[in-house]
Every structure is written in C-alpha cells, then in structure tokens.
Design a protein with these regions (language model features):
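Boundary at the C-terminal end of the N-terminal hydrophobic targeting segment
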Residues: 19-23
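A short hydrophobic/aromatic micro-motif that marks alpha-helical segments and, especially, helix-coil
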Residues: 17-18, 274
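Non-catalytic cap/lid and distal C-terminal segments of serine-dependent acyl enzymes
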Residues: 27-54, 59-382, 386, 393, ...
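Bacterial N-terminal signal peptides
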Residues: 7-17
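Positively charged n-region of N-terminal signal peptides that target proteins for export
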Residues: 1-4
C-alpha cells in the first residue's frame, strides 16, 4: 500500500508539472497568426515558424509571451518556441512533427475560400494500419504504416490493388507522410473526385538500423541497407498479408528528400519490380549500373519517372543537375518546379503528391505526362547545392540520449546557457540534478528501473523540454514527454526476434485504435480506457499493448485477443468473446499499467 501511495504521489507531481505552461495560436482574419506562450520565469522567448523564421516574443505582465506574424498562406507549418536558447514544442498543440531529432508542433491555417488538398473532407476514407515485421536482412524487427483504400474492407470485396511505397526524409519517422504529409487525406479526396485510382500506400521507415540495439556486423547505413530490407523483407510481408497486384506495372516507389534518393536508387536498380518512380526534392546517384547507358531499355521499363523540386530548395542545384543528366542520357522524365513553398518543406511534399497520385497506375495519363515533359531548367550559376558544409549545418554531430548500457541508462541534454538542468520522470518523486560538462552537455545516469518503460523530460531552468535526441514521444494531450524504452524491457521489439505480429488500426478522427492479432480467432476483447492526459495512441505508443500481446501469444501464454481504446466496444454479435476493461486511471504509471495488461492477458 505504501508503495502504491508513493507512486500515486509521484504521478500527481509529474502530471501537475505538465499543466502550468499554457499557449495557443490564433488565426486572425487578415491571415496573420498570433502565437501565445505562458512561461513567467523565462528570460527570453522566440517563436520559430516555417513561414516567418525566428522572431522575438514580448512578455506581458501576466507572464504570457506573444508575437503576431504573417500573413501566411493557408497550409500546415512546423513551429516551436525557443525558451532561453532551448527549443520546446507548444504544450497545448495536439499536432506534432514525428521526427528522430527536432521537436516541432504543427500549425494548420485553413483555406479562407474553398479547400486544401489535404483537408479532412466528408468523403469515404481509407484505413491506416501500423505493422511490425521481422527483417532477415536487418536481423531485427522493423516498422511500417499501410494505408488501405476505402473499398478494401467492403464486405465480399476480393479486389487486388496496386502498391505505392512512399518514403519520408532524413530524420523523419515512418509517420511523417501520414501525420504531416497527410497522404491518406490527399488520396481519399482525389479518389472521391475521380482524379486518382484506389491503391495501397506503404510508408516504410527510412533509417531502419536506428531501431536495432546494434547494427549487424559489417553493415553501415546506405541505400543497400534500406533497399535490401524493402525488397527482401517489407515487400514480401505486404504481399503476403494484403491483397496486392504483384508485378512492376502495379508497383510504384518514391519519396521526399532522402526518401526520394532511396526510392530512385531502389527503383532504378529493380526495374523488374517498379515502373513508377517519383522523387520529391531529391536526386540519386548517376553511377547506378545498367541504368543510364542504355536509354531505350530503361525507358521501355518505366511508365512514369517524375521529379519535383522547389527552385528555393537547398537541394535545387543538385536536383536540377540530375534532371539535366537524365536529359543528356536520353532518359525520359517529368519535371515540376515550385517557387513559393519555402524550399525544402512538407508543403512541397504534399503538393507533389497532388500532382503524382493522378498519374500512378494510369498508363495513359503517365505516358501523356512523359511525352509533354520539358528539358531541365537552364543553370544560372546561382543555384543552391547540397555540399558537405550544408550537410554539417543541417545534421550536426548528434547527442546520444538515452544511451543504454549493462550498468545503467544515461540521459543527455545540450543546453550551454542553462543555469540548471534536471531529469524528471514519472517514477521518481523529485527531479534529479544533472551535471554539465565543458561542452555544455548535461547528463545523468540512472541505475534503477532499467527494464521499465516510462515517460520523462528535462527541466531546463524550470521549463519542461522533451529529449531532443529521442525519437520516441508520448502522444499526450498536453506537454509531450519522451519515452524511455530500454532494449532490456522484456517486450522490446528490438530484441523480440522473429515472431508473428498483429497490427494496430488507427482512426484518429474517431479517437480510436484497435489491435488485431496475427493469427487465430480472438476469444477476448479488452477495452483499454485512456487516462485523462492520454490519446488513443497512448496505450500502444507508451503502453506497448500490441508488443505485449504479440509476445505472449507467440509464447503460447495468452489467447488471441482484440485490444481497443473504444470504451464502449462490444463483442461481435454471434461470436462468444470475453469482454474485459482496463482503465489507465486505475494505475499510477505506465510500468504499472503495462504490468496490469500483462496480468490480464495471462489470465485470459
């Protein structure tokens, strides 16, 4: 009882600390945006937003910092607050940018007239499923997201569909084309308008070795690592679990930034598997074997070779050079340029999707686009180019946090101007002091709770900050904590091995998520009720409910079950199922909630 009361007190302190900072954004009638951020103890606050850059905010007597910027064109823009030199997300913005590194919130400015391509409209919507699959080439488990068209699950439907493998950029997770690129809504809208064909879209993770405890021996990251996983592991998984058409005429591959490079490299070296190639703000190698020196053969295998880039993109010079290279080799390609979307941005990525979705798996439209293609724009000598210096500026030497070892887990935060940095977790009664080194990096090593999964953040001079080096964010309603998920956790995907995995189906508009087992007929329905600060994703992103069920089922310790965050869910009529309910609010921390779920699964 004492331990429970202690844990409850910690949870109350932890949650209370997340609620003090308040902010909101207001879209004004003239198209300007007013940003607000409450932090009475901050010395300096700036707002950094894609359409206006970094700008100072003014502090009011009530401790609310404000700035009005713009006007800005209707679209979605990443932004953050810079508090005393440290970037923080807007604690009251529900939308965020899922990224390995930087932490940004998302500002959505609606159209004043008409609508935007990515708007959520009253049209039939496809399904979004999160999957895990064991990759023999990586020797570990990888992630992907699968979009299924609106008709896929219609009763009696046995139709097979073409597949588009769509890859996000450097430091992006597999979620970015879903949560930032809004590819599902763009495609839903185009299909409803009769402007695109129904298709399956697979969103791979472009940096798969990051998911593993250590990179397999002899494996450095490169196109071959990603391509081997996609062609040798992900594609076979998709084609054995979904109704796909498995030939080159019905496969497409493409992506944004690094994903465009990976997509072109993989596609051009596997023209027996892909005939639609799309590059958004990118380019690829000009030395790929057996591709460029036999134009007639290469052209005969490609329905669509589509290249898009902004003239204000830092990759424009290199991308333009690649377009010109293709022209000189006689390789046909469609070229698209933008001039008003702030360069290397997801505004461009969304726009390029609206241009290419109507052409995919439509040979007539693709051929017309290829025939109407124009030569690359003539070089002016003033183009931005992707140089080692640009690379170093955009991707500085990373801070590793959290870093796991046999003796503990080390957390690090670079904040050279901070006076005090502390580690705050849901498992400790008080924040823990961190020590600063000569380079301004603060650190602390924990030797307890090494196998737990828990939420944490840093307190930088009293301001809550998510770990900028940790890609795993808790999808909380307010401030979004980081997640510490050690490979020694018994349900860690990184060390789970080759077992069957179920899938998690999200409907974020309806506010539900559902896990379906990989095999067997479910005999148990467990309703996972979210806590007051949780979202429909929390039981799976932090609670690891799907991973727990997968492993116990693979070990024969649990029966096939359905896990749902719909608190009103009922068993399917005519099917005998036990119905159980697990409330997050009944437990003081995520380790306790995970243990309760494990116990419930073992009992049933």
């Amino acid at each position: 009882m004492k331990r429970f009361l202690f844990a409850t007190l910690v949870a109350l302190v932890f949650c209370a600390a997340t609620g003090w900072a308040q902010s909101s954004t207001v879209i004004n009638a003239d198209g300007t945006v007013t940003f607000r951020y409450t932090n009475p103890q901050a010395r300096d606050v700036q707002v950094d937003v894609q359409f206006a850059g970094r700008n100072p905010m003014k502090r009011g007597a009530d401790g609310v910092w404000t700035a009005t910027l713009g006007p800005a064109a209707p679209d979605m823009y990443p932004y953050c607050f810079v508090v005393d030199g440290v970037s923080v997300m807007d604690p009251l913005c529900p939308q965020y940018f899922p990224n390995e590194g930087f932490k940004n919130s998302l500002l959505e400015i609606p159209a004043r007239e008409g609508s935007l391509a990515h708007d959520i409209k009253d049209v039939p919507h496809g399904k979004v499923e999160y999957i895990h699959y064991y990759s023999q080439s990586l020797q570990g488990t990888n992630n992907a997201i699968v979009y299924l068209p609106p008709s896929y699950y219609h009763e009696g439907n046995q139709q097979r569909y073409p597949v588009f493998y769509l890859i996000s950029g450097t430091t992006d997770t597999e979620e970015v084309y879903y949560k930032v690129g809004r590819m599902n809504y763009i495609l839903d809208n185009l299909v409803a308008q009769g402007q695109a064909r129904e298709m399956i879209v697979v969103l791979p993770y472009g940096n798969p070795t990051k998911l593993l405890p250590t990179s397999p021996q002899g494996m450095g990251f490169g196109m071959d690592v990603f391509g081997n996983d996609l062609v040798g592991d992900l594609m076979p998984y998709v084609e054995s679990h979904y109704r796909t058409i498995n030939d080159a005429d019905h496969r497409a591959i493409g992506g944004f930034s690094r994903g465009g490079n990976q997509g072109l490299s993989c596609g051009l070296t596997h023209l027996d598997k892909f005939s639609y190639l799309c590059s958004y703000s990118s380019f690829t190698s000009t030395t790929l074997p057996n591709v460029y020196d036999n134009a007639d053969d290469t052209n005969s295998k490609i329905h669509l070779f589509w290249l898009g880039v902004g003239t204000d993109d830092f990759l424009y010079g290199t991308a333009r050079d690649y377009m010109e290279f293709l022209d000189t080799k006689g390789i046909r390609s469609v070229k698209e340029y933008t001039h008003d979307k702030f360069g290397h941005t997801w505004m461009n990525a969304k726009y390029f999707l609206t241009k290419t979705f109507p052409l995919l798996f439509n040979p007539e439209a693709s051929e017309q686009a290829m025939r109407n293609s124009q030569p690359a724009l003539v070089a002016t000598g003033n183009e931005q180019a992707f140089t080692p210096g640009v690379m170093a500026r955009l991707f500085p030497r990373p801070i590793i946090s959290p870093e796991f070892s046999a003796s503990g887990v080390t957390f690090r935060m670079k904040a050279p101007e901070a006076r005090e940095v502390q580690l705050q977790t849901e498992l400790h009664a008080r924040p823990l002091a961190m020590q600063k080194d000569d380079e301004g990096v603060w650190s602390i090593t924990l030797t307890d709770h090494l196998t737990d999964v828990f939420k944490y953040c840093f307190l930088v001079d009293g301001t809550q900050v998510a770990d900028p080096s940790n890609m795993y964010l808790s999808p909380d309603k307010g401030f979004k904590h980081s997640i510490c998920n050690s490979p020694t956790n018994p349900y860690s995907l990184a060390t789970m091995g080759n077992i069957p995995h179920g899938k998690v189906c999200y409907d974020l508009n309806a506010g539900t998520a559902q896990y379906l087992p990989p095999t067997g007929n479910p005999t148990v329905l467990i309703r996972l009720v979210a806590g007051p600060d949780d979202t429909p994703e929390s039981w799976f992103k932090v609670g690891g409910a799907d991973a727990i069920a997968d492993k116990l089922l693979a070990e024969g310790k649990a029966r096939p079950c359905i896990l749902t965050t719909d608190a009103q869910a009922k068993a399917t009529p005519g099917i005998k199922m036990k119905v159980r309910t697990l409330k997050a609010s009944s437990y003081p921390s995520w380790p306790a909630r995970r243990k309760a779920l494990e116990k419930m699964l073992l009992k049933n």
